[in-house]
Amino acid sequence: MNTIVFNKLSGAVLFEDGGASERERGGRPYSGVLDSPHARPEVGIPDGPPLKDNLGLRHRRTGARQNGGKVRHKRQALQDMARPLKQWLYKHRDNPYPTKTEKILLALGSQMTLVQVSNWFANARRRLKNTVRQPDLSWALRIKLYNKYVQGNAERLSVSSDDSCSEDGENPPRTHMNEGGYNTPVHHPVIKSENSVIKAGVRPESRASEDYVAPPKYKSSLLNRYLNDSLRHVMATNTTMMGKTRQRNHSGSFSSNEFEEELVSPSSSETEGNFVYRTDTLENGSNKGESAANRKGPSKDDTYWKEINAAMALTNLAQGKDKLQGTTSCIIQKSSHIAEVKTVKVPLVQQF
């Protein structure tokens, strides 16, 4: 670079060429400066390519974690979708060829398309054939022996949700079942609580019978039951019963408390009680009012007993017209002036 210098004394202009010195100064290599002992110490900055490699490796690890999570999520989703198909395959292991209607139902249950369901079953059958290469084997035996022949990281026969490599079939413990027990339904909670499968089948009925609560036994229901049992016994031993009831009427009447005790007590006999039975048919045409008046205990109120006999006669006439149908009247005498009349229609046995 040229420099113009003005000389005040002579007024001459001098031209100096400073380019050479600058060129010499600028031409010095920087390596000498860097190599000099006075240069600043090096800062611990790694070179460019290793830094890029570290960043790329770190990015690769982060992406691998994200991709691994996506893969696991996708695998779990596929397992959930294929679970209904696995269950169907295990139930129909003897003939794993679903019809079109069954494929449509499975597609709706597994959120797959009809083509995906068909492909899934085709792949499952092909996998069973390729894994268990023994000829002349049924599908049930192939499914049973699949886990024994599978190798490596191939799919196992499992429908459990925590199995990460399941594609088709059923749980391995179930494949070890005997062939005779294939068609038996499996109820895990019931089998665990019971000792055998038979008990598991009987348990719901017994539990239902235990949970059933009988209605309260009022006096009316007890009285009807007691009358029915007594009537059968009276019809079987008519002659003996009539004699005993006559003796009972002559001996006197029970009080109301004794009657209730006799009614509630299960050990009480049909002959012991303040009951008067009279069994007859419509074809003999006997006067019911007279027989009831003869068999009742001694009473001074004739009008009262006439009303009772008339009510009994009207009740007997109002009941069916069948000749084989008879009635049995029961007079419950609680005291000398209070009585109840029970008329029960029962089929009478023809006497030969």
Curated annotation (Swiss-Prot):
Stored PROSITE patterns: HOMEOBOX_1, HOMEOBOX_2
Pfam family, one: Homeobox_KN
A single GO cellular-component term on record: nucleus
InterPro entries: HD, Homeobox_CS, Homeodomain-like_sf, KN_HD
Entry keyword Cytoplasm: no
Disulfide bonds: none
Keywords (A to Z) from UniProt: Developmental protein, DNA-binding, Homeobox, Nucleus
Residue ranges, annotated region (Disordered): 19-54, 159-189, 245-301
Subcellular location: Nucleus
GO molecular-function terms, A-Z: DNA-binding transcription factor activity, RNA polymerase II-specific; RNA polymerase II cis-regulatory region sequence-specific DNA binding
Location of the DNA-binding region in this protein: 71-132
Highest taxon in the source lineage: Eukaryota
UniProt record similarity statement: Belongs to the TALE/IRO homeobox family.
Function: May act as a morphogenetic regulator of cell adhesion.
Record protein name field: Homeobox protein Mohawk
Organism: Homo sapiens
